[in-house]
């Protein structure tokens, strides 16, 4: 059943941007938190791991619960729940509470993603699911892209205890959600099956396995770019400002790629978009890792790599939701963040390999994931609808 909610995609995309904005405070705040709590590098690593596990790996679990219970009424409160803990971190006095703050933020972020992506699918006009999902993905990418710019500028003028001022936009979006009618849109399957699918059947379905692996391999290359590009440029003799600028170019390319890929998938098949983008991404990715530069050509190649790496994501979410209609929440959680969790394993392998053969060659190895991802996407059964 389709629900007609005015500006639903705009509201959910804005909420996505805000959730990903607040959910990515930790890397920027980490140097300050190390000083405030006397954290070692090991403890910082554990803190980041807690954030990653709660944000990424919990999403399919939360999505599975949402497939059995209607959680739409919680929508207005999830953005404030994701923002408040990190904005109150200046008032935390114990390390254990710091870990709790990070975990609560991660759980709220993990809950927003599958819920809002299901609502995108339920409110999109017929034949516009991929396009609306592309705007949703772009919202999240924009939120992540602006964290360094806004948070660093804020902390240049205000102390850590002033972070609650940044909570004001979350109150506004909560009011908009309450008045939008989205809370009345059920996330439960339209036709409740007499015998619900067993979790094992969902997890080991061919579509689940191959599409998850394909997107996980894509996220390996994407994560390698996002994690090591600044370090690669600095080691190549560039300053940190240039490194930050070119990372932003890569992320903007990804945001545009998600928009274009999602909208094209409404007229072409999701498989064509995903496989085509993955194959087209091989050349710019391999070229940049063998010709590291900050000139115009380097910027154009980086933009193209980011574009092609993110173009498949909206289609993968719609594909998974259509293939698993009784478990749309779980499918959304897998495609949105579990794939990034799988990709992070590849990023860790890239880091370890970089210590042995050098960073640039190790990053070049990560490009090998793209043709494998394309093959897996090609053999994934496409849903009929």
What positions do the PLM features span?
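Residue-level signature of mid-helix packing/kink "hotspots" within the transmembrane helices
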Residues: 24, 52-60, 145, 251-255, ...
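A late C-terminal transmembrane helix in Major Facilitator Superfamily
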Residues: 326-356
